[in-house]
């Protein structure tokens, strides 16, 4: 028996639907897990391919991660403009570098490279859905697993992450694969070499941590809790898993020690940890001057309301699953309890950034499917109500997901295409947020000039602005510059999308700009940002967040 050929785990006490025809269909579907997993993965990839370029605006972190993969493809340490990069471990950068090398992708333009690598993260997202299906099927049965996978196919927050070059998607793939091996061991019924299986499970979980440190909460903490919670995982087994976990990161640390970078890594990790726990609030919703979390939730409710429901249900579903008699279900429940608790802590005290919601949603969906099966095991009379509620939630998720992937949100891509043919060769353009600075840095016409004084000093008569980040305090420009441009500038290009609001290229008269510079419109020049890599501030830096 292979890892994927796992027996169907029926929901005890739940009557099947009447009629031999439907029962036969159910049996045939349940007996072909590989085919069903592959079908769900193909559907996932197809849905993500719809809006991969046009429905998800460019983020600066994507360009950093793409460039880090490019540096590895050249045989270098992961590095940005200011030196080797240590804020995040190199797991995904190794994968990205291998793909760049294998497919001979061009790395000269970071923006183009991002859109190439989005196909990689979409493929990994499809793999994660297949793994989630197999995981839930192992402990809860085929139909709860199909429901969980279908929710993951369309869930807006999952789509948002799978469709961008973010670290969370590959990390989740490793976690789900490791949990699948662990659950297979806990549920029994398989012959073979259990020590090797446990070690491989730990190795996969360790690869998740090697991709993003914060995934230690998803990969390591549930294993530790499983030892003490109703003896879900025997200590001897946990020891083997933990041994496998430490191998990837230990190899990374040895490499840093040999190359002399261990001290720089420790500094970057210490800074990232202080940000994570809230001791230093420089990013996220709890940072000074950041928009209110409540306001942001209300603004995004049209797109992500089901995501918020799943975030709230995550720890509750985890508690239900963790109370099961079956150890595999308890382990899945513990992952949701840990991730839901982490999300609550970050929202209240730590550095909460939107992409942190992705692993919480994934853990919540898998636990919710398992919790539903657990409830039906104990209360079969609730079957009809469970089917109705789960169907309504799935329908709402699908509606929002389809709306998201069919919506236009590609202002920078459209501006880049427009500028290639319409912008004069001798134009001087001030760009006013970090993403545009990074995307356009190789074009001599553009520069990080976001005040009237900077624009005048550099002979710029064009200004590229993004309204929503500027109004929220996330751009290099201040809202007063945007107000001044509304009154004194001439818009030459305008695009509207949910991420940036209005992306506008303005033309300004030299005399009006000189008068504005004399009055100090836009305030003093913004300080450079710390890239969180080698500690040197660089103007185009962006990833100064948490590990």
Annotate each language-model stretch with its function.
Residues 38-41, 246, 327, 366, ...:
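Signature aromatic-anchored transmembrane alpha helix within multi-pass, membrane-resident enzymes
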């Amino acid at each position: 028996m292979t890892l994927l050929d796992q027996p169907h785990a029926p929901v005890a006490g739940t009557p099947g639907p009447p009629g031999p025809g439907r029962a036969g269909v159910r049996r045939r579907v349940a007996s072909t897990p590989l085919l069903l997993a592959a079908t769900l993965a193909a559907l996932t990839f197809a849905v993500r391919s719809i809006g991969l370029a046009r429905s998800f605006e460019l983020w600066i972190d994507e360009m950093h991660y793409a460039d880090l993969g490019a540096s590895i493809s050249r045989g270098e340490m992961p590095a940005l403009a200011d030196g080797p990069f240590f804020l995040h471990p190199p797991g995904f950068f190794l994968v990205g570098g291998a793909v760049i090398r294998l497919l001979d992708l061009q790395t000269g333009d970071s923006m183009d490279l991002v859109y190439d690598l989005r196909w990689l993260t979409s493929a990994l997202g499809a793999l994660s859905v297949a793994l989630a299906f197999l995981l839930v099927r192992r402990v809860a049965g085929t139909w709860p697993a199909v429901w969980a996978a279908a929710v993951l196919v369309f869930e807006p927050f999952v789509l948002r992450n799978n469709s961008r070059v973010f670290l969370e998607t590959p990390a989740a793939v490793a976690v789900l694969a490791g949990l699948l091996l662990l659950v297979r061991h806990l549920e029994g019924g398989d012959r073979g070499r259990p020590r090797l299986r446990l070690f491989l499970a730990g190795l996969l979980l360790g690869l998740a941590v090697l991709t993003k440190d914060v995934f230690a909460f998803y990969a390591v903490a549930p294993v530790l809790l499983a030892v003490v919670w109703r003896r879900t995982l025997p200590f001897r087994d946990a020891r083997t898993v933990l041994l496998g976990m430490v191998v990837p990161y230990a190899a990374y640390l040895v490499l840093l020690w040999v190359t002399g970078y261990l001290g720089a890594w420790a500094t970057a990790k210490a800074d990232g940890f202080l940000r994570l726990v809230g001791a230093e609030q420089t990013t996220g919703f709890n940072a000074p001057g950041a928009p209110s979390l409540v306001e942001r939730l209300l603004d995004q409710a049209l797109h992500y309301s089901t995501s918020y429901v799943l975030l709230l249900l995550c720890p509750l579903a985890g508690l239900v699953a963790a109370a099961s008699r079956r150890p595999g279900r308890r382990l899945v429940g513990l992952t949701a309890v840990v991730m839901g608790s982490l999300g609550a802590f970050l929202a209240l005290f730590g550095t909460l950034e939107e992409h942190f919601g992705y692993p919480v949603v994934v853990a919540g969906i898998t636990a919710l499917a398992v919790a539903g099966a657990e409830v039906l095991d104990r209360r079969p009379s609730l079957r009809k109500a469970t089917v109705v509620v789960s169907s309504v939630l799935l329908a709402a998720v699908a509606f929002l997901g389809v709306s998201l992937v069919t919506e236009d949100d590609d202002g920078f891509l459209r501006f880049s295409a427009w500028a290639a043919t319409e912008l004069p060769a001798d134009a001087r353009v001030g760009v006013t947020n970090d993403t545009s600075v990074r995307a356009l840095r190789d074009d001599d016409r553009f520069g990080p000039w976001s005040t009237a004084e900077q624009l005048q000093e550099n002979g710029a008569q064009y200004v590229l602005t993004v309204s929503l980040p500027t109004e929220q305090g996330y751009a290099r420009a201040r809202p007063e510059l945007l107000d001044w441009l509304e009154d004194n500038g001439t818009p030459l290009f305008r695009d509207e999308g949910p991420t940036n609001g209005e992306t506008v290229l303005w033309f300004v008269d030299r005399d009006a700009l000189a008068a504005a510079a004399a009055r100090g419109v836009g305030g003093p020049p913004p300080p450079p940002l710390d890239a969180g890599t080698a500690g040197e501030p660089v103007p185009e830096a962006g990833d100064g967040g948490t590990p």
